[in-house]
Amino acid sequence: MPRSGKKTASTATATAQVEWRNRILRHELTDPKTLIPHPDNWRLHPVPQKAALEGAMVEIGWIQEVVVNQMTGHILDGHLRIELALEHGDSTVPVTYVDLTEDEERLVLLTFDP
């Protein structure tokens, strides 16, 4: 909003935005062996990052769910956490299942924080 406190055309439009859709279907514990790494995942994790995450997982545990597309079974966020869970023999991992098209999946891969 401008300093004068008056709404301009651009701020008035911003207030009339459409409500965001909730694409989350459910949260559940899932066998990590059933989850599929996304074939278009471009993020590579260096050894120090993997070691740091492993140390945090050992000391703290799970604090964030992995995100998986219900339609394809592809992991959208949490590839490294799943890799570590498989290496450590975890039988379940916390997962948020979402409902996205394959095009939306690719957009999520490009925009989620690494």
Please describe what each predicted stretch is.
Residues P2-L100, E104-P114:
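Short, charged/polar connector segments at secondary-structure boundaries
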